[in-house]
């Protein structure tokens, strides 16, 4: 799973 911060979209 790619690193997704809190402001990251669920597209990853």
Swiss-Prot record:
PTM per Swiss-Prot/TrEMBL:
Both amidated and non-amidated conorfamides As1 are found in the venom. Amidation is important since amidated peptide is more active.
Task: Give its localization.
Answer: Secreted
User: What tissues harbor this protein?
Assistant: Expressed by the venom duct.
Residue(s) carrying Phenylalanine amide: 12
Secreted recorded as keyword: yes
Keywords noted in UniProt: Acetylcholine receptor inhibiting toxin, Amidation, Ion channel impairing toxin, Neurotoxin, Postsynaptic neurotoxin, Proton-gated sodium channel impairing toxin, Secreted, Toxin
What family does this chain come from, according to its entry?
A: Belongs to the FARP (FMRFamide related peptide) family.
Known function = Conorfamide As1a: this amidated form is active on both ASIC channels and nicotinic acetylcholine receptors (nAChRs). Shows a weak inhibition of peak current of rat ASIC1a and rat ASIC3. Inhibits desensitization of ASIC1a and to a lesser degree ASIC3 currents, resulting in a sustained opening of channels in the presence of low pH. Inhibits with a slow reversibility human alpha-7/CHRNA7 nAChRs (IC(50)=737-4984 nM) and with rapid reversibility human alpha-1-beta-1-delta-epsilon (CHRNA1-CHRNB1-CHRND-CHRNE) nAChRs (IC(50)=215 nM). Conorfamide As1b: this non-amidated form is only weakly active on both ASIC channels and nicotinic acetylcholine receptors (nAChRs). Shows a weak inhibition of peak current of rat ASIC1a. Shows a very weak inhibition of peak current of rat ASIC3. No inhibition of desensitization on both rat ASIC1a and ASIC3 are observed. Reversibly inhibits both human alpha-7/CHRNA7 nAChRs (IC(50)=2029-8464 nM) and human alpha-1-beta-1-delta-epsilon (CHRNA1-CHRNB1-CHRND-CHRNE) nAChRs (IC(50)=820 nM).
Put simply, this protein is called Conorfamide-As1
